[in-house]
Amino acid sequence: MVSQLVSGFSIFQNDTNMKTSWLAGLIFLSMLPIGAAAQDKGIDDFSKNESICYCMPNWSTPNNVVGFDNNWQLLRAMQVPRSKEELDSLGIPCTYSQLQLLRDWGLIERNEDDRYQTAILLLDSAATARLRAHSRRLSDELVGVIRPSVTDYVRLLERDGLGGHAYSLLFSLVTDGLTWKRLEADGRVRKMELTLKHPMWDGEFWTLYPKRDFYCGTNKSTLGEFSISLNWSEKAFQKMIPLFKNSYLVPRMFDDLSKSDRVSDAEVIAGLSPFGLVDGEGHPTIPVIREDTTDVIYAASWKMAGTIADFLASHMDTVALRKEFGFVDGSQSIVILYHEMLWDVLAQLEQAGLVKRPAVLADPEHARPEEFGKVIFLTRSEAEK
């Protein structure tokens, strides 16, 4: 999922099943070594780049490694293959252990001539502008296709008293959730797996410059038959820290909900009700969705995700994208371009008045704690019985 993020955006302290997208840096195609064009004067500052990790991490995500020391400067310099001696001659300090760390994390490769080259995509402003132009064009078409389904979806949620969750469910469950599952099932996007070859993380990690004015992502944590998903932005995450301090209560909430339709643990109610996850009697005030087509919300989500996946398969020219941007294969092409489409599609739906951005995403500074639940939902696996 964004899919976009910053490591540590985990609801569980012992999160072992996250699919994310971390946003904070950038990655790809400027073949200039370091300086770049005048409009890219901020690109050398990693914090001014948007970094996205669509990945399965082991214990951390690669954006954290990029942020250490001068690793970002090294990655920028090694877009052109360079030896350590050449880096030294450019006045770019580095150690062999630093280079080994970057290799271990799959961020650079060593060539046969003992030169190091960046192995991830760093998109400069020109490439980012072209990519986002493709995204806007395809998003315009996609919104035209799914608009009737979105209208019906919002009505369905409103019928169940969940209209305030429409934005985050459309983003985190449908477009940044089940659509990926559909694409993986169809073999259009590579499934992620931690292996001996990829022990730290598996998936895609890239950066873009400049950042979007607004972007959000999804973090998902699973424990047993329950998963909790958070639709986050960087500023919203900071605002929600008081809730995350009570994250130790979430497994106990799961335990109660596995036995009943309400939470009975008084400490859980006291700790989570102020943030809009349960009411004073322990009834969930956030969506609890069974991952089963007998659940009407899940069925509608799954159907719309299929429509989106089919659209991407028929409208995205991955061959042309590989030539233009240097993507390694069709899977990477879809992952990177569709991540841009995620925000463009939701922005268009929001502009059309079909969905409304939750307060904690729209205006984090003034959002009330009881509104935090609007960006959170639970899913329950089919093995619940």
Over which residues does each language-model region extend?
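Short, amphipathic alpha-helical interaction segments positioned at domain boundaries
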Residues: 120-154, 290-322
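Short capping segments at the starts of secondary-structure elements
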Residues: 79-87, 247-263
